[in-house]
Amino acid sequence: MPTEQDLPELPPYSLDVQAMDLGAETKAVGLELIETESREPLRGDEAAAIWAAVFPALTNEEPWVLDFFSHLERVREFCKNHEIAHREAAGRCLVVPQPEAGKLRELLGRFAGETFGLRCGKTAEVADAELEGGLSQRGLDAYQAAYRRYTFCGICEPDDGWVTLLSETLWASEIIRRVRPALKEFDVHIARPQ
């Protein structure tokens, strides 16, 4: 029996990637960023930096956008002050197309306490009036009917340590393959709990 001294020391942070059961009609994978020892969500600057590396890696160089549908005035003002490109959509939705790494990190750090969306795929290159109207009215529930038109749609809750990806094509193993290179610079253990 190995003693505690014989066990390998795990990195301070873990990214757990696992399939989620959201019903027969919905395929989803959850990503949970936690402190390894406490199992609590990772928050703060380190979390923002890790998520800012994970998001572009998930997209595999496909077009992507962030969708904000609450506290729009604060998001709009932040984007304006930090010269982050954005567009107004459907009244109560603000779309931020592919912010560069430093700006993404700032955005994620500032709005970590918010729930927002992440869309990826060829269709993210152009406005999606139907989805953006749905986001304005129903929030991220609108992704349920739309995610099949995209490589994935993600529900992002950084302060809770969660991103839930709705996708017909991405499995947990593919997500791990995509994010592993991006996480090499961080001390993060990637796990696939069963």
Where are the regions a protein language model picked out?
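Structured alpha/beta or helical-core interaction and ligand-binding surfaces enriched in interleaved
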Residues: 1-194
